[in-house]
Amino acid sequence: MSLKSFFNFNKKTKLHDIEEDVISEIGSAGSALRTDAHMLKANDVYYKSETDSHTVLRFMKPSENEKIHPVRHSKYEDKSKLPFETIPDPVLKYVKRARDAELQPQLAKVSQKLFADISTATAAEKLQFTVPRRARFEINDPRNPTFSMMALQDIISVLEYRRNKNPTSTAHICIDKKGKEAVSYSWDKILNRAKQFASVAQNHVGLKPGTRVILYYRKSEASEYIISIFGCLLLGIVVIPLSPSSSSESLKLVVNEEKVRVAFTTEATYRIFIKDTEVNNAKSLAWWKSNDFTNYKFEQIKQYRMRANDTVLIDYTFSSSTYNDIKAVYTTKTFLSQMRNLTSSMITNPARQAGWKLHNFEDSKDVLITNFHPSMPLGLIMGVFNSVFAGYCTIFCDEEVLKTPGLLAYLITKYRCTYSLFDYAGLKQTVYNYQEDPKSTLSFKKNYTPNLSSLKLCMVECEVVDPEFNIIVSDRWLQPLGTNNSKEVITPILCLRKFGGIPISFKDWMISYTNRQKHERQMADTCYQEILVLKSSIEKEKVEIVPFLDIRKYSPNEVLCMSPFWYPIPEASVAVVNEDSKNICKVGEVGEIWVYSDCLPKLKAASVINNPQGEQLTDYENNQENKFEKNNSFMDSGLKGFLHNEKIFVLGNKDEQIRQYRKTMVADKLMEEKYVHYSHYLIKKIMKYVPEIFDGVAFEIEIDKAVYSVLVLESPIIKRSLIRNNRLKGRDLFSELVKITESSFQVTQDIFKLDVLSILIAPYKSLPRSRYMGIQAINTNKCKLAFLSGNLPVSYVRFFMDSALPKSKINLNNSKGIWSKDASKHHREIISLNVKQKMDPYKHQNKVSKARENLLNHFTILDFLKTKSAKTPTSPAILTFNAIEKTKVELTWAHFELKVASHVEYMQLSVKAKARSHILLLYYDPLEFLISIHSCFHLGVIPIPFQIREISQLIGEIEEFTKIAKAFNVEAILVDHKVLISLKSRDISNHFQQTCIDLNMKAPKIFETTGIPISKRAKKALNLITPGELNNKGKVALISINKLEDGSIIPTQFSHSSLLAFCHEQKEFVIGNEEKPIIGGIEFSSGMGLLHTALLGVYAGVPTLLIKQENLCNNGSLLFEAIEQNSLSKVMIPLNICQKSFSTAQGCNSIVINSTLSSIIVPCYDRPISSRVNSIIEDIARIGLAPNKVKLAYSHPINPFVCWNADSSMEKMKDYFDANQLRSGLVNVREDVLRNRQPLLYGSGTSTLYNEICIVHPEEKYICQEGEIGEIWINGKHGSYCENNELNSGCELLVQETLDKKSYSRTGQLGFIHHLKKKDQNMEKVPVLYTLDFIWNTLELNGLNHSVKDIEETIELVHPNICTDGCILFQASGSVVILLEVHSQQKFASLIPIIVATALAAHEIILDCVAFVPKGTFLRRPTGEKRRADILKQWTGGDLKHMTSYLIRQDFLLNEDFVGTELIGTTDSYDYSDENLIINSSQLNLL
């Protein structure tokens, strides 16, 4: 029998009659493939790639100057409303896309290995792969069986043949929403219109072959799109279809990426979507209206015959439901292969056999009805190109047709459609409408009876087959409406969405290469295709099929009913590959589905849209490591499934799988087993058992190397129109949401045994969706990105920590901290080196002589002032520097002494200050402060310096200095003129009086010292004053108020001998014998700033150059101008001021500065913040300053200058340490590739001056070994510390045999000593002191010691809505609470999961309560530091007004009444009244 005569449709020849003729030729197909595969070299390397698509959390710094998420009515843009792809630098970032291009060379090797494995496979191995089926017969024209379609080599040739053969036959029909025929074209009309389009495009637009154009048409303009695409094919123009539903950003990206200069559209579309937009203003893009081309005179065109490898179409799929943005390139060969293979499958339908009935319609012409627009790849292939090739008519209907009851059945009956192509979403609308009201279909029109007997195939586009719905369609819609063999008619069609929607498998009746006998073919192809699989085996990635007779042995939830697609289309092969090893899976295993076919388009690098950084994109096929052509390569489809009887079974998308690891005992060993779930089945079960759920999505995130599942569900009960006072039509909304989440969690536990971290409830149809194949589906990738960026529009969130916590490494049962005896014993066992952490003064440092020691103990700073005034009275003592007057001599030594004497006289007469009394110095001008403090020293008055940094922020300082005045019983307050004017203002004065009343104290008197007249008589009286006992070592001469960065205030008392000892250290180790001025006035209330401003210049006899802090912060170049003009060698500047001034500096004379300047000393009271230090280093490089000029120093309230980096720069003192080890109390330097993810610490000093430093265990009080963390203890050589009292850090004896009971002072700060190698000193190890946080700024949880500052900084980066420095974390009564200050009141519920996940992933800490407060609620100092103690006092007292609160651990709810007011936050506006506060601080009973 001739194979050509088989396709003669006038004969009713059965397929099995020609089986013997064809079966002999099947073996050559496999041999040909093996021959091709032997040409490829097999690689025996074990392939293992990180192709998993789980979420990775990465922490990134946001831009400091970026204005994001402001309050409402702001002129700035609210970036939370931007598309998810354009969110600037999300902190927790989904980083899968960056790896796609990097994996392509490896994927090419995997493809090569698959060919080698298939070519060498034997039948005994039972591997899951298929050999391509090849039709060993001519593919003839169904309308003309004597003509072979294989002779046509391009699409235009096919169109010309179809026009010549069937010119008047209907080609395409467009149906509107009401079912009326809008447009109908014949083949002749289509070609004529296409030539008219090509004539205008070539002669008027000037397009040449290879030019890329955009076709911009709406759904209702399908006919115009078809004509345009054929017109472009006539000229060899590359088509890029875009829909007006795409965003303008997508259009701009395509224009820029493809360098498009011309776009075709219609007049209506241009007027609606383009005319008044910014896209129209782009001069590089010209818009042409194709519906006006009929007005142009037709001119002859020069037709271009496209070759096989010429590009025909470039399809951008923007954010399909499961994949990122892709770019598929179609060639002529690709489309011809698709048309030939699809036609060879469709025409083998045995509809003309006995028992099948078919009406005649235009000489048995086939008709396809579909709702897929031709701009979609599937609609273009099946509805346009394959329609031309096979000669059938295509009816394009609107989506509303499927929603109208009875309309689809009417159209199928009217046009006698033989094929239909829909998706599940559209077909469900029609079927369910028929189930609810059959009369609307049966009596849709008078004298009309629905008859679907003409349907041969009802094709349904999907990735996962729904067997339950297939039965409903066949038994309850097709069969009642006249379809015979309805179960055979319903045909799922597998389209690879990763490749833009290319069909790769659907039902056909071609002979399978595996069916060697007639009865085997009939058994495999005509019986029911559904199989029953044990769900437990699928979870273990195995396939265990249950016979239908054994179904009673299992419960319904233990068995999964699955339906296949079919064999791969002709000329295609499928292999199931192991996800880890990349080997072909054996029968009974689940793996990745890899496809080999000429029908697949050429993929360019994916995620072009989501690649804003502009990384180099890799061409999948043009990669140099891919040594074979595309048609010889397997491609990863992104699906997971298996083969059974050579048919494809798909479980779901690889990106949508949810992994779970369970620990089980196997042979007395604890083993971890991997289980895999698929979100498709998970959401389907939840929707089945929880009727309140409309739709949802499930995905996984990775926290601390553990995988957690997150469910985001949509419920119609949450609507803004229904929410009113948290009530839903008489029912409590919260109770309803609790019921939904508990039911959903119960489903995941009972059926899937899946532990869920959190369940989020979103309003109806509010989750991010993407339009794909004509439907709106939830976009999993967008939901992941929105979840990680905290932008999901959820209204309720609930955590299930009890089920999720066992996966983490957190030991909840370990109540002992790192300072316990057991922990100390464990540390000693781990650390092998028995080296004590101790830093001694360098041996070359000279000891203090007895004369010098006697001088320090029996004299004061007043003696040095008198001596200097007597010897060099005309030498400059005080200099000032500003941007206008530059350097200016304010006072000489004689004039300075005279000013001090006049000030003393004023204090005696007006202030009436007595010796040993306390006076608060409240100054903004450093010169006036300098005079006042020396006047206090002369009178024996104890001064308490308090610097006013900004006059405008004085009102924020009132509470602080008022509390200090009460604590020390201050008798008077001395101020300068600017401070006095500010204090006399009505608001500040009333606030000061009210604060004194609240503190139950009498307001101290205020005296202005600016402009005191100079009196020569006062100098004579000053010489008669004898300080008396001021030089006594145990008497207090000064009280320093130290403000730490965390907001803490530490007052410290010093004697004159202590102050002189500090000055001596500065003179010997910093200034030396130089006579150059020293800079002061920047920070003059405490620490080294106080020494350099008020004392060091007098002690060393050098001038003091005063620079105001405000001037320096506003103009950082002022510092370098002062250094250059005065030839300064060493400068002291605090860390925060250094960062601000360096950032504002425009530049400097780097040559002069580097030659003159020796070092800029930056004292740090706390751990140097790495971000600030890095910023300083970057500014140093920008300015041109030598990097070794800036050096860090360790300061403490009890010792302003403990140690410093005398010989090394900041860059050499840094290192990365293991964060987990630091929390455990150990020190471990990370040297691997992951070191950049660990904390970066900068060393605080190597030179200890005259001090001895030890790292001491704070509980056991022994010196720690190297490798441990402990408390920093200091021993001073010069009696630098005062008496021990309640207001001062005290002294404590450290008893150790190796130490002769030396007196050490506790700093209260944690740290360690680590040895670094120095290349310039013969690799000698130098001890470096690294400081951590103060003990009161740490949390001990679950046996770990956490830094509050690190946790707060990490959580601040979670979302831009959180204010800078807007987090406060504290622990009270066993609960960990975090307060967040936010810009705007929106999407709080979406922030909760990512905040909790971030804390758990980065710091292994579990938050118990999260509360949000509006911006401006936190009390702050003028410098911006949070007043932590005052904020906590407001919270515990119930005075802190907050928006809403969320409890994470449900066991912290106190009573039933409290549960009813629990954690619900909606996207509506919040009421700030006390009655509507959801969680009150007093109810938590935290303190």
Swiss-Prot record:
**What GO annotations for molecular function exist for this entry?**
catalytic activity
Q: Which cellular component, as a GO term, is one annotated location?
A: mitotic spindle pole body
Quote the Pfam families the UniProt record gives.
AMP-binding, AMP-dom_DIP2-like, Mug62
The record's annotation in InterPro entries points to:
AMP-bd_C (IPR025110), AMP-bd_C_sf (IPR045851), AMP-dep_synth/lig_dom (IPR000873), ANL_N_sf (IPR042099), Dip2-like_dom (IPR037337), Mug62_dom (IPR056881)
User: What superkingdom does the record give?
Assistant: Eukaryota
Q: Name one GO biological process term.
A: acetyl-CoA biosynthetic process
Q: What does this protein do?
A: Has a role in meiosis.
Its recorded name reads Meiotically up-regulated gene 62 protein
Question: Which species is the source of this protein?
Answer: Schizosaccharomyces pombe (strain 972 / ATCC 24843)
